[in-house]
Curated annotation (Swiss-Prot):
Native species: Pongo abelii (Sumatran orangutan)
Domain text: The C-terminal half (AA 188-389) is able to bind cyclin-B and shows a self-ubiquitination activity (mono-, poly, or multi-ubiquitination) in a HECT-like sequence dependent manner. The BRAT1-like motif mediates inhibition of the endonuclease activity of CPSF3 by forming hyrogen bond and hydrophobic interactions with the active site of CPSF3: Cys-144 coordinates one of the two active site zinc ions of CPSF3.
Entry EC number(s): 2.3.2.26
Gene: UBE3D
Region (HECT-like): 353-389
Cellular location(s): Cytoplasm
Disulphide bond pairs: none
Descriptive protein name: E3 ubiquitin-protein ligase E3D
Catalyses which reaction(s): S-ubiquitinyl-[E2 ubiquitin-conjugating enzyme]-L-cysteine + [acceptor protein]-L-lysine = [E2 ubiquitin-conjugating enzyme]-L-cysteine + N(6)-ubiquitinyl-[acceptor protein]-L-lysine
Top-level taxon: Eukaryota
Residue spans crossing the bilayer: none
Mod. after translation: Ubiquitinated by UBCH10 (E2 ubiquitin-conjugating enzyme).
């Protein structure tokens, strides 16, 4: 294969379950030099009159050069080809909810944005997932007696933690009324017109970090507080606070939520809405087995993949598992008809997050989309993006 370029952009997406890869070599620039491209199982090699550039693939990715097919040149994009690939999908997940919470363990709740301790050294005796929204209907269908819990909310007892789709429910009765220091970094801000901060919880009360003023959650009752997974890190009290870039954390939490919900409920369409009940994004999960190369190193320089940058330090051997999604922004009254259609569809699942986090997620999606090769940015009327797991 030959092309003319002084510097070629490389895009590589490997599908683990399909054992296939899409390789795109950026469109040559005018005035470039001839270049021969060689594909080997563990590397890509580009030869020009000036020398040879070799891009090493991560150890978990191996290409099958003889399977190359579908070779075509796409104007404005570059050289496209597909080939077989072997990839190991093992990836180090950011520990956030189910993975980090263990019963009988003392945990500390941190504000993810600034690292402030929100709840210190809380021993969780029970860590339980909340049932799905249709659990009451299932009880009525399968039980021969009336449901004793019909229309009653589930509230955690002291030292309980209930896990929802995108939030934790924690009982803070003791901490609130006995003025324990574990809640001292958190202030209760009432959303009423007088805007006074009161200790007495109300249904419309936000929980805000005193240090960075980020909304962490809201009070559900006088004893129960909801913390959003995108705002809180829960660690064993024996471990220190992990420093994770905010965009990296947000997309990992959302990606893992999408994967778990799609697996548990066979739903692939999601409405991302704020705590103000406004819909910000419509998401459609395409697949969760993509492996995307983030950084490519050669002898002269390091080419960084802009696709998923935000970034932890990446090296030539790193690859990240990612979910591939279609999305539609819904801010400024966009896509109102589509929102109405999705709201009436029982197969669509809603995820509620702080409004500021919804905008953060939209920015992450837009940045991912803008850095994709132009031919991959749209599918039908939706935009395409990757969220790093």
């Amino acid at each position: 294969m030959a092309a003319t370029t002084a510097e070629t952009r490389v895009f590589l997406e490997v599908r683990g379950q399909l054992q296939s890869a899409l390789l795109i070599l950026g469109e040559p620039k005018e005035g470039g030099m001839p270049m021969n491209i060689s594909i080997m199982p563990s590397s890509l090699q580009m030869k020009t009159p000036e020398g040879c550039t070799e891009i090493q693939l991560p150890a978990e990715v191996r290409l099958v050069p003889s399977s190359c097919r579908g070779l075509q040149f796409v104007a404005g994009d570059g050289l496209h080809l597909r080939l077989q690939a072997h990839a190991e999908l093992g990836t180090k997940l950011i520990s956030m909810f189910n993975q980090s919470l263990q019963a009988q363990e003392c945990c500390t709740f941190y504000c993810q944005s600034c690292g402030e301790v929100i709840i210190n050294d809380r021993k969780l005796l029970r860590v339980l997932p909340l049932p799905s929204e249709n659990w009451g209907a299932l009880v009525g269908e399968w039980c021969c007696h009336p449901d004793p819990f019909a229309n009653k909310p589930l509230h955690p007892q002291e030292n309980d933690c209930f896990i929802g789709d995108s939030f934790f429910l924690v009982n803070l009765r003791t901490s609130l009324w006995q003025q324990r220091p574990e809640l001292s970094p958190v202030e209760m801000c009432c959303v009423s017109s007088d805007n006074h901060c009161k200790l007495e919880p109300k249904a419309n009360t936000k929980v805000i970090c005193k240090r960075c003023k980020v909304m962490l959650g809201e009070t559900v009752s006088s004893e129960t507080t909801k913390f959003y997974m995108t705002e809180i890190i829960i660690q064993s009290s024996e471990r220190s606070f992990p420093i994770i870039p905010r965009p990296r954390f947000v997309q990992s939490v959302i990606a893992q939520c999408l994967v778990q919900l799609s697996s548990a409920r066979s739903t692939f369409r999601f409405m991302i809405q704020g705590q103000d009940d406004k819909v910000y994004i419509l998401l459609w999960l395409l697949n969760s087995d993509s492996l995307v190369i983030e950084s490519l190193r050669n002898s002269k320089y390091i080419k960084k993949f802009p696709l998923l940058e935000d970034t932890l330090k990446a090296d030539s051997s790193s690859a990240w598992s990612a979910v591939k999604v279609l999305y539609q922004p819904c801010i400024k009254s966009r896509n109102e008809k589509l929102i109405s259609s999705w709201e009436s569809d029982i197969s669509v699942h809603s995820l509620t997050l702080p409004s500021a986090t919804c905008l953060e997620l939209l920015l992450i999606l837009s940045k991912s989309n803008a850095n994709l090769p132009s031919s991959l940015r749209h599918m039908n009327s939706f935009q395409v993006a990757f969220l790093k797991i």
